[in-house]
A protein has these predicted regions:
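Active-site beta-strand/loop signature of hydrolases that rely on acidic residues for catalysis
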Residues: 3-8, 34-53, 115, 141-165, ...
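Short catalytic/ligand-binding loop motif for oxyanion handling, primarily in non-cytosolic enzymes
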Residues: 12-14, 51-54, 75-76, 123-126, ...
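Structured beta-strand-rich core segments of catalytic domains in phosphoester-bond hydrolases
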Residues: 48-123
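Surface-exposed cleft-lining segments at the edges of enzyme active sites
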Residues: 96, 119-134, 138, 172-176
Length: 200
């Protein structure tokens, strides 16, 4: 199964240029070129920034199965989706206490694996929410192991795990920027303690 994840920063934006004026798929846009080049069975989008009322505009995207999670907290914010040509069972969102009102996760189950795609909240000004998110995600990943299937977690984790994940080693060790904080990195590394590995 070939899976591609893409943080698109707005699926409706002109920069995506998905559709022609007659609403057909633009075969010259980056999305179409990516499909032609890689031919993925599954595409995951992060930061779609669209609302539920816009989802029907994307029905003609060349994937048979689609799962969207749009922000209900505010317009033009967050959002993720999973598009697939392989049938899946939609498991909804991670069990965050607010019901994932910001549209930050989608979970689907294929015959051979479970795929989780996330847009993890940035901790800047929201440290407590980020800690809650990390705790819920850890517990959910632990729980999913009971399915005895491969578990794939993808998306924007908003954390710098290793030096190779950032442009400057100095930023990683001397910064107080969100994503570089020690507790965020340690929380992320807890996933490895329960059998997950970091790939990129």
């Amino acid at each position: 199964m070939k899976i591609i994840g893409w943080n698109i920063n707005g699926i409706r934006g002109k920069s995506m240029n998905l559709f022609n004026k007659d609403k057909t798929i633009n075969n010259e846009c980056e999305f179409s070129r990516m499909l032609e080049l890689y031919n993925p069975e599954v595409v995951c989008f992060g930061e779609t920034k669209c609302q539920e009322i816009h989802v029907e505009n994307f029905e003609q995207l060349p994937f048979k199965y689609k799962s969207w999670n749009c922000s209900r907290a505010r317009k033009g914010y967050s959002g993720v989706c999973i598009l697939s040509n392989i049938e899946f069972t939609d498991l909804g969102s991670i069990p965050i206490n607010d019901g994932d009102i910001e549209g930050r996760s989608r979970v689907v189950e294929f015959e051979e694996c479970v795929l989780i795609y996330v847009y993890t909240p940035n901790s800047g000004g929201r440290g407590e929410y980020r800690i809650e998110w990390d705790t819920v995600m850890y517990n959910y990943l632990e729980e999913l192991k009971e399915k005895n299937k491969m578990i794939i977690l993808g998306g924007d984790m908003n954390v710098v795990n290793m030096e190779q994940d950032i442009h400057s080693r100095k930023v990683l060790y001397e910064s107080k920027l969100p994503g570089t904080l020690l507790h965020e990195r340690l929380n992320f590394r807890k996933y490895f303690d329960i059998g997950y590995i970091d790939i990129w």
